[in-house]
């Protein structure tokens, strides 16, 4: 298939890179995800795609949300600035006139990380903790996509039935407790509210209040992993996303796991491809699909 242009559409940023036949990323760049609606998202995609449309053979897209029938539907529209539905496939085809393959970002990252593991595992899961919480599942060596693209939306499993209302409309989802957005929201009652990134900086400096907020997030992830271990007999979990890859977060998740009986624990490790799992996974999936 030659070279492809991979895009990773997230709640905070849109990343892009050319992916060679050998899997090397070239010219990686990223821009902030626009918050103004469909027109702004289309313009952002054109900015990233247009310079490459005569240099690549296909477009591969990993995107937050539900990817089905060529459309992007946000389970939690707040993660995309309120955008609930977008004709992603038609938009990209109109810009590039190139073959295009779409996949949810968690599913794409899971596919890339599964390849990086080699042939050692049949059942694994990728978890991204970032603006939201998402994931992708490999079961019996196959990526679960689902009939409607919903497979792997683990951030919308239940964490606290009495918790805050999630942007999806359900109360107490894992995303509403553990995401970077939730971490930032936890500080709204502080004398000086701060971002999730600042909470991590404060925790690194020994701030107990900040550490407590991060521990709450890590505990919610550990409990969700326990549920997924029992449902899917997972052998390993790969952790990614800006929160998931933050210094010390993995260790907090592992510490929270240790409070559970052994049968509920599953080995967890950081993403091999770091922040590029979605880009590479989308390209790998596209090559296998076209």
From Swiss-Prot:
<feature type="binding site">
    <location>
        <position position="173"/>
    </location>
    <ligand>
        <name>Zn(2+)</name>
    </ligand>
</feature>
<keyword id="KW-0808">Transferase</keyword>
<dbReference type="InterPro" id="IPR043129">
    <property type="entry name" value="ATPase_NBD"/>
</dbReference>
<feature type="binding site">
    <location>
        <position position="156"/>
    </location>
    <ligand>
        <name>Zn(2+)</name>
    </ligand>
</feature>
<dbReference type="InterPro" id="IPR023945">
    <property type="entry name" value="ManNAc_kinase_bac"/>
</dbReference>
<dbReference type="GO" id="GO:0005524">
    <property type="term" value="F:ATP binding"/>
</dbReference>
<keyword id="KW-0067">ATP-binding</keyword>
<dbReference type="InterPro" id="IPR000600">
    <property type="entry name" value="ROK"/>
</dbReference>
<dbReference type="InterPro" id="IPR049874">
    <property type="entry name" value="ROK_cs"/>
</dbReference>
<feature type="binding site">
    <location>
        <position position="168"/>
    </location>
    <ligand>
        <name>Zn(2+)</name>
    </ligand>
</feature>
<comment type="function">
    <text>Catalyzes the phosphorylation of N-acetylmannosamine (ManNAc) to ManNAc-6-P.</text>
</comment>
<dbReference type="GO" id="GO:0019262">
    <property type="term" value="P:N-acetylneuraminate catabolic process"/>
</dbReference>
<comment type="similarity">
    <text>Belongs to the ROK (NagC/XylR) family. NanK subfamily.</text>
</comment>
<feature type="binding site">
    <location>
        <begin position="6"/>
        <end position="13"/>
    </location>
    <ligand>
        <name>ATP</name>
    </ligand>
</feature>
<protein>
    <recommendedName>
        <fullName>N-acetylmannosamine kinase</fullName>
        <ecNumber>2.7.1.60</ecNumber>
    </recommendedName>
</protein>
<keyword id="KW-0119">Carbohydrate metabolism</keyword>
<dbReference type="GO" id="GO:0008270">
    <property type="term" value="F:zinc ion binding"/>
</dbReference>
<comment type="pathway">
    <text>Amino-sugar metabolism; N-acetylneuraminate degradation; D-fructose 6-phosphate from N-acetylneuraminate: step 2/5.</text>
</comment>
<dbReference type="Pfam" id="PF00480">
    <property type="entry name" value="ROK"/>
</dbReference>
<keyword id="KW-0862">Zinc</keyword>
<comment type="subunit">
    <text>Homodimer.</text>
</comment>
<feature type="binding site">
    <location>
        <begin position="132"/>
        <end position="139"/>
    </location>
    <ligand>
        <name>ATP</name>
    </ligand>
</feature>
<keyword id="KW-0479">Metal-binding</keyword>
<keyword id="KW-0418">Kinase</keyword>
<feature type="binding site">
    <location>
        <position position="166"/>
    </location>
    <ligand>
        <name>Zn(2+)</name>
    </ligand>
</feature>
<dbReference type="GO" id="GO:0009384">
    <property type="term" value="F:N-acylmannosamine kinase activity"/>
</dbReference>
<keyword id="KW-0547">Nucleotide-binding</keyword>
């Amino acid at each position: 298939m030659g070279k492809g242009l991979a895009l990773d559409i997230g709640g905070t940023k849109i990343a892009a890179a050319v992916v060679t036949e050998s899997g090397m990323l070239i010219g990686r760049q990223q821009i902030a995800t626009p918050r103004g609606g469909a027109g702004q998202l289309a313009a952002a995609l054109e900015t990233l795609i247009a310079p490459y449309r005569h240099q690549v053979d296909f477009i591969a897209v990993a995107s937050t949300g539900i990817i089905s029938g060529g459309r992007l539907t946000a389970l939690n529209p707040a993660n995309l600035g309120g955008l609930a539905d977008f004709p992603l496939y038609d938009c990209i085809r109109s810009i590039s006139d190139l073959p295009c393959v779409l996949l949810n970002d968690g599913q794409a990252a899971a596919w890339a990380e599964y390849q990086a593991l080699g042939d050692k595992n049949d059942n694994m899961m990728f978890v991204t903790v970032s603006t939201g919480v998402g994931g992708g599942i490999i079961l019996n060596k196959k990526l679960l996509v689902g009939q409607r693209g919903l497979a792997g939306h683990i951030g919308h499993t239940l964490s606290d039935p009495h918790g805050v209302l999630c942007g999806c409309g359900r109360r107490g989802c894992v995303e509403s407790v553990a995401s970077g957005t939730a971490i930032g929201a936890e500080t709204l009652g502080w004398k000086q509210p701060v971002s999730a990134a600042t909470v991590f900086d404060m925790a690194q400096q020994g701030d107990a209040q900040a550490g407590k907020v991060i521990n709450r997030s890590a505990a919610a992830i550990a409990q969700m992993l326990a549920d997924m271990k029992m449902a899917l007999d997972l052998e390993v979990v790969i952790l990614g996303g800006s929160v998931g890859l933050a210094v010390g977060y993995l260790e907090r998740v592992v510490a929270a796991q240790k409070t559970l009986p052994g049968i509920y624990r599953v080995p967890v490790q950081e993403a091999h491809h770091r922040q590029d799992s979605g880009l590479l996974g989308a390209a790998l999936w596209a090559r296998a699909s076209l």
